[in-house]
Every structure is written in C-alpha cells, then in structure tokens.
Amino acid sequence: GGAVQTGYQYAVKNGYQYAVQVDGDGQHNPEFIRKMLQVLQEKNVNMVIGSRFIENQGFQSSFARRIGISFFEKLIKILTGQKVTDPTSGLRVADRKVIEEFAKQYPSDYPEPETIVSLLTSGYSVAEVPVLMNEREHGESSITFSKSVYYMIKVTMAMLLARIGGGYKK
C-alpha cells in the first residue's frame, strides 16, 4: 500500500489527471488500459476496475481465492449497494479526485476492497470493465493459506470500519 500511495502522491505533485494502477507480477495486460480510460471518461466515473469475472475468461485464480473474492463481492454489495465483481483486482484507473484521496489516505495492507467501500461510501463512482488476466509471472502471492483467515478477518473489519466511518472525508 505504501508504494502505491507514493505513486498517487507523485501524481498529485505533478498534476496528473489520471493514474493507472497495475500489480507488478505480470498478471495485468496493459492492452486494457485504453478501454478502461475510455470508460472512465465516457461514463464520467471516478474509478474503473479491470474485472476478470465479468466475462469469466483468461486466468481465474485458485478456487480458495475465488471464494474469498466472492465473499468480498457480496460484502461490498451489502455495505454500498453496488456490485463489484472483482474487488481484489489491482488493475485500476483513477481520476484526479480519487488520485487526491489515495494520496492522502491509502491502506497499507490488502487495500483494494477497503478502498472500494471508502470510495462508494463517500459518493464516488466506480465502474468495471471486462479484462483478461494472466497467471502470475513473477513472485508469489502475499496471501498464503495460513494467512488467508487473518486476511479475511482484517479486510472484513477494514471494510466495515470504512463504511461506518463514512469513507473519505470530502
């Protein structure tokens, strides 16, 4: 989270109107960035998430991970009223308003679901576009089986607190 927040701070400092976020493990195909930016601009939304689950094509991750993703999808729907099919996706495009929010406040651990709840609770708009993701090319997931229970509890609590706390303070 800290490195991502530093990127958003750099974007604020240099006057960027848009920021693209990708994971560094080779999963995200850059060919979808143009479409995501187009949706951001045409639909006038604040953030676009690349979702591997809208069309269920390409790499889908492990069964256990998909169960966790499904749990977070349902929790986001309960907390915000909006369905987000791939809440753990790190492939995102943000507008200037979101860049400024993330530059000020960005979770350090497993931030994607929490930031979605914070944005939606604060009145920002989020859309998804279908993308194809590749299997991880480099490194290993930071979420091992032994850490998965801790991860689920920590992220669930962070999402609940984001909702109760009212999201980002405008």
Language model segments and positions:
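Acceptor/aglycone-binding surface of glycosyltransferases and processive sugar-polymer synthases
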Residues: 1-14, 18, 30-109, 136-157, ...
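Short, hydrophobic alpha-helix immediately C-terminal to the catalytic nucleophile
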Residues: 5, 116-117
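Acidic metal-phosphate-binding loop of nucleotide-sugar-dependent transferases
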Residues: 26-27
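Catalytic donor-sugar/metal-binding loop of nucleotide-sugar-dependent glycosyltransferases
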Residues: 83, 107, 117-134
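Sparse recognition of residues in long alpha-helices and their boundaries
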Residues: 114, 168-169
